[in-house]
Amino acid sequence: MFKFNDEKGNLKCSFCGKPQEQVRKLVAGPGVYICDECIELCSEIVVEELGVEEEIEFQDIPKPKEILTILDEYVIGQERAKKALAVAVYNHYKRINTNSKIDDVELAKSNIVLIGPTGSGKTLLAQTLARILNVPFAIADATSLTEAGYVGEDVENILLKLIQSADYDIERAEKGIIYIDEIDKVARKSENPSITRDVSGEGVQQALLKILEGTVASVPPQGGRKHPHQEFLQIDTTNILFIVGGAFDGIESIIKRRQGEKIIGFGSDPNIVDVDEGSIMSKLIPEDLLKFGLIPEFIGRLPVLASLEQLNEAALVQILTEPKNALAKQYQKMLELDGVELEFDEGALAEIAKEAIERKTGARGLRSIIESTMLDVMYELPSREDVKKCIITAKTITDKEKPKLLLEDGTELDEGSDTKTSA
């Protein structure tokens, strides 16, 4: 029986070594003693461990509307895609909580395909979902994968990235999210099955089938190729949510051809109908992915299709300023640490957006444009304690003029010198 320190004697804690006189309570066990401080420490460790278990159980899955509201804080536009993702993610983790089987009805996985041009927000959507749910997240590039036996990465290395993201906690990793980018680059070259080996196309799709559906995979703990004498990590992929994304360049013409099969007329192509480019992707169906070069079994394991639109100038300006982690806010915070207020006028934001559209890089290209614009400023300002404000104008972007630098009294620093001029 445990007892408190009501006995006198030269007793001390078996864990921290403190004598009885230096602690408030000393609990005795068969041949051992533990003090109140060590009990408190052990209690904290247990609570912390139980907290992780509760996190894994997903008892409070956010509802689709709540997921969409949080996505809106980070991702501009793409309303249809965000709604599809919110529903798919909610259903996926609800399925995990019910062990995927209710009254003999087995709930299938809701793996997702994101289709949209470069810089439209595919990767950001996947990252934000993982952040909302507080689950491990990993990104893989499909172009680096090859089927087993060929030079390149095995598909199991994707799972290793997720395990590493979960700090090698396999149970946590088994409820994570994996985003595979550039999936369109592993499409086979034609609709018909190839009689020759396609190691980085159809072969990769075949290799991905099992982990998409759910299997216990053997993963080399250090990555690389498998060899017979190494130990493997075992991970069950049944409850891992897979999101695959790609630009799928040219799929619009496949959709148009299907839409226009019965359209005939003098001087017109009977296979193509004139459809608004903005709405064409909303008519995407799985058969279009089959025509593009994904194999039927692969498409069957990706039941949720979500298409993203090309971002226009207005959307790119919003991306620069509105999200919680907007680029403009990031650079303003960066200069604020040097005691300088940064301002982008409306003309500057519009020109940054136009340049990103011209480069065909979408939102992904915004950072590089701002970075090149701000390089000289970020180099000079840490050494200029007299400068209190920096203004980026449209001409700073288009004509490469230097930004306006204002001193504490509101006067402008003369370009190329320390001379003050009227602001």
Swiss-Prot record:
Q: Which Pfam families match?
A: AAA_2, ClpB_D2-small, zf-C4_ClpX
Query: Residue ranges of the ClpX-type ZB domain?
Result: 1-54
Which residues are recorded as binding ATP? Answer: 117-124
Report a single Gene Ontology molecular function. Answer: protein dimerization activity
Q: Name one GO biological process term.
A: cell division
Give the UniProt keywords, A-Z.
ATP-binding, Chaperone, Metal-binding, Nucleotide-binding, Zinc
**Which InterPro entries does UniProt cross-reference here?**
AAA+_ATPase (IPR003593), ATP-dep_Clp_protease_ClpX (IPR050052), ATPase_AAA_core (IPR003959), Clp_ATPase_C (IPR019489), Clp_protease_ATP-bd_su_ClpX (IPR004487), ClpX_bact (IPR046425), P-loop_NTPase (IPR027417), Znf_CppX_C4 (IPR010603)
Keyword Iron found: no
UniProt xrefs under CDD domains: RecA-like_ClpX (cd19497)
Sequence positions that bind Zn(2+): 13, 16, 35, 38
Q: Where is this region: Disordered?
A: 404-423
Q: Does the keyword Chaperone apply?
A: yes
The entry's cellular-component GO terms read: HslUV protease complex
Which PROSITE patterns does its entry note? CLPX_ZB (PS51902)
Its family remark reads: Belongs to the ClpX chaperone family.
Q: What is the role of the protein in this entry?
A: ATP-dependent specificity component of the Clp protease. It directs the protease to specific substrates. Can perform chaperone functions in the absence of ClpP.
Complex and partners: Component of the ClpX-ClpP complex. Forms a hexameric ring that, in the presence of ATP, binds to fourteen ClpP subunits assembled into a disk-like structure with a central cavity, resembling the structure of eukaryotic proteasomes.
Q: What is this protein called?
A: ATP-dependent Clp protease ATP-binding subunit ClpX
